[in-house]
Amino acid sequence: MNPSLSVFTHWNDESNQSEIFSDPVISNCEKILRFLAPEFLHSLELSIYLVNDSLMAEINEERRGKPATTDVLSFPLYSEHPPIPVQILGEVVISMETCKKQAMEIGHGLVDEFYRLLVHGILHNFGYDHETNEEDALLMRKMEDECLDLVFAT
């Protein structure tokens, strides 16, 4: 069964909308979520926030007690056994300022870096974790590659 999907995008700085457009983000999230979603779900909801470094630092301090900016944060609400077949997956927050800096440092495009961060955040919302042990890190990396292949398939 293919779940119905709701993806919500929110910007705190409209200048980012000229580089990352909402419609492709939503359609690419739908590809990723359909790939990752368990069969029993009837619907799945995800919120994506694109923010500047200042707001990211505020969110990071408020939600994690770390008063610094970062590239991506995930706040999962996912449960493997929800009481009903409707699931609010969680939130992904991406600092577009940090995303731009990292893209330049790494030497690839902003869109590539944006989707790398988005996929990373979505996977965390599904319970993947690269910090527990090497095996989990390798699995998460494999899933990141598979999701990015879906996004960038020609």
From Swiss-Prot:
<dbReference type="GO" id="GO:0004521">
    <property type="term" value="F:RNA endonuclease activity"/>
</dbReference>
<dbReference type="InterPro" id="IPR023091">
    <property type="entry name" value="MetalPrtase_cat_dom_sf_prd"/>
</dbReference>
<dbReference type="GO" id="GO:0005737">
    <property type="term" value="C:cytoplasm"/>
</dbReference>
<keyword id="KW-0690">Ribosome biogenesis</keyword>
<comment type="similarity">
    <text>Belongs to the endoribonuclease YbeY family.</text>
</comment>
<dbReference type="Pfam" id="PF02130">
    <property type="entry name" value="YbeY"/>
</dbReference>
<dbReference type="InterPro" id="IPR002036">
    <property type="entry name" value="YbeY"/>
</dbReference>
<keyword id="KW-0255">Endonuclease</keyword>
<keyword id="KW-0963">Cytoplasm</keyword>
<keyword id="KW-0698">rRNA processing</keyword>
<dbReference type="GO" id="GO:0006364">
    <property type="term" value="P:rRNA processing"/>
</dbReference>
<dbReference type="GO" id="GO:0004222">
    <property type="term" value="F:metalloendopeptidase activity"/>
</dbReference>
<protein>
    <recommendedName>
        <fullName>Endoribonuclease YbeY</fullName>
        <ecNumber>3.1.-.-</ecNumber>
    </recommendedName>
</protein>
<keyword id="KW-0540">Nuclease</keyword>
<keyword id="KW-0479">Metal-binding</keyword>
<keyword id="KW-0378">Hydrolase</keyword>
<keyword id="KW-0862">Zinc</keyword>
<comment type="function">
    <text>Single strand-specific metallo-endoribonuclease involved in late-stage 70S ribosome quality control and in maturation of the 3' terminus of the 16S rRNA.</text>
</comment>
<dbReference type="GO" id="GO:0008270">
    <property type="term" value="F:zinc ion binding"/>
</dbReference>
<feature type="binding site">
    <location>
        <position position="130"/>
    </location>
    <ligand>
        <name>Zn(2+)</name>
    </ligand>
</feature>
<feature type="binding site">
    <location>
        <position position="120"/>
    </location>
    <ligand>
        <name>Zn(2+)</name>
    </ligand>
</feature>
<feature type="binding site">
    <location>
        <position position="124"/>
    </location>
    <ligand>
        <name>Zn(2+)</name>
    </ligand>
</feature>
